[in-house]
């Protein structure tokens, strides 16, 4: 179904996305796409509406600000105390520094990470 063309729409909102949210948006968007002239999809296509996922990347300062209070994974360009990957609760982010509460073996520790040293950041699932 859908040939080789896929139109993917990612949606998000505070509190997360439900299956009902994706179904409702699909029901609204699909008929509207059919009214566009000239048709941007002359061949059959598949419409895919979904959320960015549980482990979505945090690519901007705004995304990190919105993730305060969430469990995240951060990879660094430069290690801090010989550690390049931290996973824990993002306690704060002021635009320049991330503060993360993480487990070091059996103890909670807090680390301040300069934003410019962050290579990648994403939400993480706490197991």
Swiss-Prot record:
Keywords linked to the UniProt accession: Cytoplasm, Ribosome biogenesis
Subcellular location: Cytoplasm
Disulfide bonds: none
Main localization, broad class: cytoplasm
Any one biological process term the GO annotation gives: translation
Gene Ontology CC annotations of this record: cytosol
Superkingdom of source: Bacteria
HAMAP family (alphabetical): RimP
PANTHER family to which the protein is assigned, alphabetical: RIBOSOME MATURATION FACTOR RIMP
NCBIfam families: PRK00092.1-2 (NF000928)
Family to which the UniProt record says this protein belongs: Belongs to the RimP family.
Function: Required for maturation of 30S ribosomal subunits.
Protein name per Swiss-Prot or TrEMBL: Ribosome maturation factor RimP
């Amino acid at each position: 179904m859908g040939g080789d063309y896929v139109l993917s729409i990612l949606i998000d909102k505070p509190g997360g996305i439900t299956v009902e949210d994706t179904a409702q948006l699909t029901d609204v968007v699909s008929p509207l796409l059919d009214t566009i002239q000239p048709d941007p999809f002359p061949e059959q296509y598949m419409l895919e509406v979904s959320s960015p996922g549980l482990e979505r990347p945090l690519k901007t300062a705004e995304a990190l600000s919105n993730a305060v209070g969430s469990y995240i994974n951060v990879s660094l360009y430069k290690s801090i105390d010989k550690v390049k990957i931290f996973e824990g609760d993002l306690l704060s982010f002021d635009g320049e520094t991330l503060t993360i509460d993480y487990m070091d073996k059996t103890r909670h520790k807090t680390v301040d990470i300069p934003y410019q040293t962050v290579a990648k950041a994403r939400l993480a699932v706490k197991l």
